[in-house]
UniProtKB/Swiss-Prot annotation:
This is Membrane protein insertase YidC. Residues 38-92 are annotated as: Disordered. It is found in: Cell inner membrane. One of its GO terms (molecular function) is membrane insertase activity. The chain crosses the membrane at residues 3-23, 357-377, 394-414, 464-484, 495-515, 541-561. CDD domains: 5TM_YidC_Alb3 (cd20070), EcYidC-like_peri (cd19961). Residues 45-58 have a biased composition (Low complexity). Required for the insertion and/or proper folding and/or complex formation of integral membrane proteins into the membrane. Involved in integration of membrane proteins that insert both dependently and independently of the Sec translocase complex, as well as at least some lipoproteins. Aids folding of multispanning membrane proteins.
């Protein structure tokens, strides 16, 4: 029995240790943040923004790019060079799922809000702001043309012209184009076009170059995400103990589908990104949401990262190969930009591997089918090759779906659990005999162990049979933890009564208290350990776990509570049958 109890305690300790290690390895950002400098809402001076721009002449230079040579400077007139502009001149774009603001200086996305995802469950009319540039910090998407005839350089960035100050996707329309225009001294006309689609968080960014000049036009497309090192504004907070999630960069490459690049990595010269990738994507990942550049999949683009130490800003960028356009010809340099929720099916359809930004950790192969089953129970939909098929029968409530999922998991492990509870019941039945053996041979440990093993053999008891089945189920619990923590579908998902968000802690601690009470009842069905120390540990374990669960997502505690109730019922029936047997 001591072996059994020791293994149970060891299993709990190992699981807790692995969870803490996973948090620290994958999610913790231990770098001390540098105070963010005051940033004007529109990126005030041309020099401050241009210092962040990539250089096609020296793509291996991972420091802040220097000015290019004179003959490589862009052919923009002084009037086109960026000047400070008031925030009122931002171009506003509204679709059914996006609220976007574009700065004419550079044509950058400097604010992006998601009306379908409120900032707080109690303020449904206040959308979550994913990207923004203001005095509190910077998180923007930049793009442009660099090179000999590019629009962006160390000299500054262009001021794009727009026919309208505000754009809105009209009801009944499926697409909205926002055109920013620029004419270079060489005669080249450039249109920077943002294309928004109904119901989509994917934005097509096209640079249409019409070479009306007399000489070839040469340039390259770049796109980058610039973000400061502040905390994730969308982080789920639970009292004084926020649930930690990954905050940092990620990218796709052919040799490794999913690569994390933490902010600490980006600040180190020997770790930062610097490679050529065919297709792929670069992303800034945070809790529930992601922003990502998806370059032309047919091109080999140069991926790099830069850390601006003085401003505590991190840049993740790509630069395409040079494009040459002959006089009288036209060409389109394009990429795509995604900014929105981490919806797995949508992300997979956009670019291979982008759905991996929903980080289920090292047990992803268990988490993914659990999530698929949970979605089916809630909505009645199944995903086949990226297509959602509505079979019907969904319960329409994520909390009820979690309860049904628990029933299914419990049914799968029914026999294993029965083996465990049967072993525990037998141990409880022979506990008086074990105590007698211990007292009779308290001075002879070897004889005590021998007689105890003979007792186990005679009663057909496996001392490990009670704990090993429990340990087998632990990976499922950890995988479900990641599902409930990472899946944006459960963000602000209500259950019943006081629980209006299953992704955060129970505000009144009702579920953790009930979970602790259920654990206490379950321990009463187990044999009391002979060792006083182990007995004390098992006595206080329900309270310790109840306190530990106070700050866990309510959905996870609901799963554990439901599982405990089912386990108690199963164990009570098995224990009663064995104790009543001859």
């Amino acid at each position: 029995m001591e072996i059994q109890r020791a293994l149970v305690i060891t299993g709990i300790a190992v699981v807790s240790y692995l969870m803490i290690q996973a948090w620290q390895r994958d999610y913790a950002n231990t770098a001390s943040p540098v105070p963010v400098e005051q940033v004007a809402e529109q990126g005030n001076s041309s020099s401050s923004d241009s210092a962040d721009l990539p250089s096609v002449q020296s793509q291996t230079d991972n420091s802040i790019p220097s000015a290019q040579s004179d003959n490589d400077l862009p052919s923009v007139s002084p009037a086109d060079i960026a000047q400070p502009t008031p925030s009122s001149q931002r171009i506003e774009v509204n679709t059914d799922v996006l609220r976007v603001e574009i700065n004419p200086v550079g044509g950058d996305i400097v604010r992006l809000a998601l009306p379908d995802y409120p900032k707080h469950v109690d303020t449904p009319d206040q959308p979550f702001v994913l990207m923004d540039q203001n005095s509190n910090g910077t998180y923007v998407a930049q793009s442009g043309l660099v090179g000999k005839n590019g629009t962006d350089s160390s000299k500054g960035r262009p001021h794009w012209n727009s026919a309208q100050q505000s754009y809105r996707l009209a009801e009944g329309d499926n697409e909205l184009n926002v055109d920013l225009t620029l004419t270079q001294d060489s005669g080249a006309e450039i249109i920077k076009r943002y294309t928004f689609e109904k119901g989509s968080y994917l934005i097509r960014v096209s640079h249409i170059v019409r070479n009306n000049g007399s000489t070839p036009w040469t340039g390259a497309l770049y796109g980058q995400i610039k973000r400061d090192g502040r905390d994730d504004p969308g982080l789920s907070k639970a009292g004084f103990a926020p649930m930690p999630t990954y905050l940092g960069a990620a990218y796709w490459s052919a040799d490794k589908p999913y690569n994390k690049l933490t902010f600490d990595d980006m600040s180190e010269d020997d770790v930062k990104l610097d490679q050529t990738v065919e297709g792929g994507w670069l992303a800034m990942v945070q809790h529930y949401f992601v922003s990502a550049w998806i370059p032309d999949a047919k091109q080999k683009n140069h991926y790099s990262s830069v850390y601006l130490k003085s401003r505590d800003q991190y840049l993740l960028r790509f630069v395409s190969p040079n494009t040459t356009i002959q006089p009288g010809e036209e060409s389109v340099l394009y990429s795509e930009f995604y900014a929105g929720p981490k919806q797995q099916d949508n992300l997979e359809a956009i670019s291979p591997g982008l759905n991996m930004t929903v980080d289920y950790g090292w047990l992803w192969f268990i988490s993914q089918p659990i999530f698929a089953l949970l979605v089916f129970l809630q909505s009645g939909e199944v995903s086949v090759f990226g297509m959602d098929i509505d079979i019907g029968g969904g319960v329409g409530n994520w909390g009820v779906a979690i309860i049904l999922l628990t029933l299914i998991i419990k049914a799968i492990f029914f026999k294993l659990s029965a083996t465990s509870y049967r072993s525990m019941a037998k141990m409880r039945k022979v506990a008086p005999e074990m105590q007698r053996i211990k007292e009779q041979n308290k001075n002879d440990k070897q004889k005590q162990q021998m007689e105890t093993m003979n007792l186990f053999k005679r009663e057909k008891i496996n001392p490990l049979g009670g704990c090993l089945p429990m340990l087998v189920q632990m990976p499922v619990f950890i995988a479900l933890y990641y599902v409930l923590l990472e899946s944006v579908e459960l963000r602000q998902a209500p259950f019943f009564l006081w629980i209006n968000d299953l992704s955060v802690m129970d505000p009144y601690f009702v579920l953790p208290i009930l979970m602790g009470a259920s654990m206490f009842l379950q321990t009463r069905l187990n044999p009391t350990p002979a060792d006083p120390t182990q007995a004390q540990v098992m006595k206080w374990m329900p309270m310790i776990f109840a306190v530990f669960m106070l700050w866990f997502p309510a959905g996870l505690v609901l799963y554990w509570l439901t599982n405990n109730i089912l386990s108690i019922a199963q164990q009570w029936i098995i224990t009663r049958n064995i104790e009543n047997s001859a």
